[in-house]
């Protein structure tokens, strides 16, 4: 998994790319949590994510809960079909704010 962050106006976009599985969740978690400290509006772009397992989904849930605690806006942006199917299967498509 690769990632990069980009500041666009008042929001930070975290771009995740590749596979988010148990071996790669630490990097995903760190990049998202760092962004929560720096901005009130965070978008996690999942357009280029080809695979996500339960540990990757857990990172997203933890980030959403942390954003709620910090009263910050947290969005999943343009989730790939692979990500969206996992979110729907777990009924998490209604838990997250999803932006296309």
PLM feature spans:
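Amphipathic alpha-helical interaction surfaces in cytosolic regulatory modules
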Residues: 22-95
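Short acidic-hydrophobic, aromatic-tinged amphipathic segments that line or gate anion-handling sites
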Residues: 97-100
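STAS-typified acidic loop motif
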Residues: 4-29
